[in-house]
């Protein structure tokens, strides 16, 4: 079957590698279905038709995790019309190296663009995920650890403005996209302004412009640098 064929590509990887294989497969091959067709709520939508909503994606992630020997369940949260959240939302809780984490491939799917795969929602603790997810309807295991949080593992979770400045300088010089997680306390408006100043100063020094996207609840920033000077762009990601 397609699932077995897919799983075969990842069976030699370690547990974290298998998890990332599943995440990246979803991000690269499944389109979020804004029309919400019936099959988009099922595994066939994600794995058969390449389109799905959160429920279909979460079910597909669970199926692939089952196939690759990763403990996984589907988590479900209630809608909250007062906050403008019209629908329930589904994602996954996985167990990696014996520890429980939240994994939301749907949210990363909608954030990933320009060939940049996003990992903002890979291996989050409760206190991170519930910044922008409603409480779960059915109990899931407590996720209290963030040692396997993707950006932390990859050492792109930074705590000082100086570190951000050094990395920004390198990114401008090499013409690379800068993608990182801010861990130096809360990402307040004041901190964000300080970081924006850094991006713009370093870009301007090389006659470039900084285009910044911010996932505010998760404190993840993505910065592109382009030639020329003009309007700086700041986008709040949803």
Annotated model-derived regions:
Residues 56-128:
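Hydrophobic/aromatic-rich core segments of domains that either
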Residues 37-52, 56-63:
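Conserved active-site-adjacent core of cysteine acyl-enzyme catalytic domains
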Residues 8-9, 48, 78-87, 232:
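Intrinsically disordered, low-complexity coil segments
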Residues 33, 104, 213-217:
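Acidic/polar residues at beta-strand termini and the immediately following turn/coil
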Residues 1-14, 46, 125-238:
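N-terminal accessory/pre-domain segments preceding catalytic cores
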Residues 1-46:
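Secondary-structure boundary elements
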Residues 10-18, 49-57, 84, 114:
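Extracytoplasmic/periplasmic, Sec-exported soluble proteins
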Residues 23-27, 62, 193-196, 200:
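Generic solvent-exposed, charged/amphipathic alpha-helical segments
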């Amino acid at each position: 079957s397609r699932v077995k064929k897919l799983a075969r590509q990842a069976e030699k990887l370690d547990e974290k590698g298998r998890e990332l294989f599943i995440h990246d497969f979803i991000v690269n091959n499944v389109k979020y279905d804004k029309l919400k067709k019936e099959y988009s709520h099922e595994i066939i939508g994600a794995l058969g038709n390449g389109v799905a909503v959160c429920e279909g994606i979460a079910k597909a992630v669970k199926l692939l995790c089952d196939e690759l020997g990763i403990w996984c369940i589907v988590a479900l949260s209630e809608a909250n019309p007062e906050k403008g959240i019209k629908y329930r939302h589904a994602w996954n809780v996985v167990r990696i190296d014996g520890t429980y984490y939240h994994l939301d491939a749907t949210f990363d799917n909608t954030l990933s663009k320009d060939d940049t795969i996003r990992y903002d929602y890979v291996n989050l603790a409760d206190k991170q995920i519930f910044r922008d997810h409603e409480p779960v309807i059915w109990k899931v295991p407590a996720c209290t650890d963030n040692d396997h949080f993707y950006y932390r593992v990859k050492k792109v979770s930074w705590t000082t403005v100086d570190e951000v400045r050094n990395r920004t300088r390198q990114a401008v010089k090499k013409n690379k996209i800068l993608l990182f997680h801010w861990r130096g306390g809360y990402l307040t408006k004041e901190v964000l302004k300080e970081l924006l100043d850094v991006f713009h100063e370093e870009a301007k020094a090389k006659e470039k412009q900084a285009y910044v996207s911010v996932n505010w609840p998760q404190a993840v920033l993505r910065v592109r640098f382009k030639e020329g000077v003009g309007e700086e762009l700041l986008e709040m990601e949803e």
